[in-house]
Amino acid sequence: MEEEFILKKYFIQYMKNIKGLSDTSVKHYIGSLRTISKFLRERNLINREVYEVIDIDMLRRLREIVYSDSDFINKNNRGKRMYSAGLNNYIAFAEGEDFKDIRDKSLLMDIPVPVKAVTGKRMISWNRSGIIRNQALEMAEYRCEVETTHESIIAERNHKLYMEGHHVIPMKKQMNFKNSLDVYANIVCLCPTCHRKIHYGVKDDRIKMGEKIYLDRADRLVNSGIRLSKREFLSIILY
């Protein structure tokens, strides 16, 4: 069985649990994106599905290509714009639209996402989704989740506080887990100071930060199929 894309799983969760759409509506959107994926595959722009794209700028460029194609325009018009509606809704999701309003509902987005088992002795590089990272920052409203009073510069890119996404359990530990670590529950929004501190600060400070994060995220990690005791958690993140 092929591994299902994490962004597809999250998009379905988002439509059902956050947007409150019916199973029928969700099925229509997924069907529209299946057609979009076929269009992109036929032009050698993706390998399998649109959900494999982990960079939001690339996703936007693909939308421009799709919407400028005369064959797609005709097909979309015949389908009463159902295909463009599916893609527009997916990109709005990928951009983190409304994510700042779902912080209290974040548990509804957390699901286990199995990763393929890796065999053999070789160097492994685990992909990190820029889309998921940015969504996590949106969910945190661009506020440091360790020290909420910490300020930062205003970023030119989005005119929001500059924050950084930190994988609490490092991606290099992925081989020790059957479920993905590149998930919302494992990404915290940190100001640059706290991000440096959790990597390079004195051990006592890092322990305090780790304890706070564990308190805030333990249940969400469990929902994502990542179950660790406090001792196990701290031993991993303090490496």
Region spans (language model):
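Append "and, occasionally, other polyanion-binding protein interfaces
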Residues: 28, 131, 163-166
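Non-catalytic DNA-binding core/recognition domains of DNA-processing enzymes
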Residues: 19-94
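A detector for short metal-coordination/catalytic motifs
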Residues: 160-239
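Hydrophobic alpha-helical segments and helix pairs
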Residues: 97-106
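Short terminal alpha-helical segments
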Residues: 1-25
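Short, charged surface segments at domain edges that flank catalytic/cofactor-binding sites
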Residues: 106-157, 172-182, 237
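A glycine-rich, aromatic-flanked flexible loop/lid motif
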Residues: 1-7, 157-165
